Amino acid sequence: ARDHANVLALQNDGKILAAGSEANSNASSAITPSLYRFNADGSVDTTFGNGGRAVHRFTGNSAGSLYGIKVLDDGRILVTGVSSTIHGFGAMQFLSNGQLDTTFGTGGIARINYSMGGHSVASLFLPDNSILMATVDISPTNIVLARMDSFGNPYPNFGNNGVVETGIVGKY
């Protein structure tokens, strides 16, 4: 397996979270969004998820990766990323034990479908636990913003179903 960590967060108890992806082969479809947890001493926290990792796809067999992470006040973990197969923005919410939080999105996973070519996503977690994400689209190459509420629903009054094509040229 080839695992990648794209972003880190620290829990109040000193445990370390790393979000990124794992790939079991060189095929792009084999890249799966993944969340890992380590103890304060750097050892794998085997009590988290499945042996220290929580691996879930945004939908079906879609490839993707995680690029944002926030530990919520109650210990739940909110992550954001991209699904390159369905070309969309995504978020997942986990309980502190690494299981999906089924009160978020659909079964713990939320998506905003948008044909963006599967690029990395910058994320801003707002004080009300809503999420603002940005990426660069392939065609046309412009910066695209997406916003979800704290339950994983697209903001209806933010662009078109939660997505704004800014018209500002970006670099792919």
Model-inferred region functions:
Residues 1-172:
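Extracytoplasmic mature domains of secreted or surface-exposed proteins
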